[in-house]
Amino acid sequence: MARYRRNRSRSRSRRRRRRRGGRGGRRGRRRRRHGQRRRGRRGRERTRRRRRRRRRSSS
């Protein structure tokens, strides 16, 4: 999976470097990747907590 993502980033980086520049493109990608990881972990934790609360209230 990691290799496939890197290949995609290289093809996109060439296009973005001409428009935004290498620095802006790299920073934007890093922020997006971290954001997805944090949202995924927080989202799973919240759903688990909500389900437990519903079960307790029903009991």
Curated annotation (Swiss-Prot):
Keyword DNA-binding: yes
Protein name in UniProt: Sperm protamine P1-type
Family the UniProt entry places it in: Belongs to the protamine P1 family.
Matching InterPro entries: Protamine_P1
Domain of life: Eukaryota
GO cellular component assignments: nucleosome; nucleus
Tissue expression notes: Testis.
Molecular-function annotations in GO: DNA binding
Stretch list, region Disordered: 1-59
Compartment list: Nucleus; Chromosome
Organism: Chrysemys picta bellii
Coiled-coil parts of chain: none
Main location: nucleus
Keyword flag Nucleus: yes
Keywords recorded for this protein, A-Z: Chromosome, Developmental protein, Differentiation, DNA condensation, DNA-binding, Nucleosome core, Nucleus, Spermatogenesis
Function: Protamines substitute for histones in the chromatin of sperm during the haploid phase of spermatogenesis. They compact sperm DNA into a highly condensed, stable and inactive complex.
